[in-house]
């Protein structure tokens, strides 16, 4: 009986290479958490009922379409966000209804109200020098102002679709602070 030494040796090499690759994958999460950058994930609330003269703007709820948008985006975010992400929401009902679909702990932040200042909010988050990942759920035009200011856009604000996410990363490269646009995701495209 002939034993194929070459195929037996090749099988051992494949197992050894698999173990190496597997251990690298396991260590990837550990290395990711040790990186020195700040992620700012900005999520605009999903579609809400229209404002009317006699209603309080902060009490507007999501529409049926808005709930579907929030669920789709929350499922995507849950797969992407690292453990330990600090989540903040505007106290407005439509923002809370949006962030609740994520099913993670969050805090209400008064600087995320519709008439708040983007500068005050960024200062309270210590953007861009803090470390870790922050998820903010808020309103236009403030989140558009945050994005434009962080990316150094000429306009003072940019348009942001309802239920969409903009993921920004602040990092230091060659002694210079940079803001990188990691991704923009729309609930309608999921």
Predicted regions and their residues:
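Short, Lys/Arg-enriched N-terminal segments with co-localized hydrophobic residues
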Residues: 29-37
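Active-site-proximal alpha-helix that buttresses catalytic centers in soluble enzyme cores
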Residues: 39-119, 143, 156-163
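Compositionally biased, low-complexity segments
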Residues: 2-3, 19-21
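Short amphipathic alpha-helix with an adjacent loop that forms part of the alpha/beta core around
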Residues: 120-128
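Domain-level recognition of soluble alpha/beta enzyme cores
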Residues: 154-180, 189
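Non-DNA-binding regulatory cores of transcription-related proteins
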Residues: 128-135, 140-164
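Acidic, Ala/Val/Gly-enriched low-complexity intrinsically disordered segments
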Residues: 3-5, 10
């Amino acid at each position: 009986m002939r034993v194929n030494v070459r195929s037996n040796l090749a099988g051992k090499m494949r197992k050894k290479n698999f173990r190496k690759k597997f251990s690298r994958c396991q260590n990837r999460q550990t290395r990711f958490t040790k990186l020195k950058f700040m992620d700012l994930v900005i999520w605009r609330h999903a579609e809400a009922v229209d404002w009317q003269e006699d209603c309080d703007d902060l009490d507007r709820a999501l529409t049926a379409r808005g709930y579907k948008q929030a669920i789709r985006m929350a499922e995507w975010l849950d797969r992407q966000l690292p453990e330990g992400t600090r989540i903040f929401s505007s106290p407005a009902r439509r923002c809370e209804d949006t962030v609740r679909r994520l099913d993670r702990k969050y805090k209400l932040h008064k600087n995320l109200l519709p008439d708040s200042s983007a500068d005050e909010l960024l200062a309270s988050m210590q953007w861009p020098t803090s470390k870790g990942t922050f998820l903010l759920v808020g309103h236009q035009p403030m989140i558009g102002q945050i994005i434009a200011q962080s990316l150094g856009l000429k306009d003072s604000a940019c348009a942001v679709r309802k239920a969409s996410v903009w993921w920004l990363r602040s990092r230091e490269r060659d002694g210079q602070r940079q803001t990188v646009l990691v991704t923009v995701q729309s609930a309608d495209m999921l």
